[in-house]
Amino acid sequence: MKKPIDQLKPEDAIPLFVKIKKLILGNKKPDGFTRLIFSFSLFAWFMLMSWNSISYFVLLTSDIIEKNKGFSVQEVIIKNGQKLGFNGEEFLASLHGFLFHNLFIWLLIFIGLALMYRKKRIYTLFVFGGLMIHFVYMFFTLGFQYFIEDISFFDKILYFILILGTLIHSFLISKEKETALKNSVSEPNEDSENL
């Protein structure tokens, strides 16, 4: 049932997107609270991941930007690194490595968010583990001063949303699982008493 390429329409891609969504998020729709926390967390993740990706892309294309615009991105980064107490070239290399490795760390966190949507308890390991790797790597390569001075207040709010949302949701999901376990244990006892 393949159509010739000249007869394809944009809406022909919709079944593919539905399949990808089902593959990532599963077939079962979670409760409203999980969807709400997931939406806020996904927004925070998307903004932080986008900012990381754009920063890495700008760093990769800094030579092209300098040729076309006459603006040296690397000089700005080197000066900023010197303000933070780094040797400028060292800071540039550290920032490049940090941004590159964070692409994979943000992917790990996304896997955790997909597991959150599916209400799998293991998702906290992916989200908190990814964030812990992110922050430890940031502090060791760029320093705590980088977090204080160069991470914007908006980004700090996004980190807060991601962490707080995950904490609240993981606490409530563990309570929900405990309640379900208690109810399943008490039901067989009631049946045996009725006999």
Write out the residue ranges for each language-model feature.
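Topology signature of small-to-medium multi-pass alpha-helical membrane proteins
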Residues: K2-L195
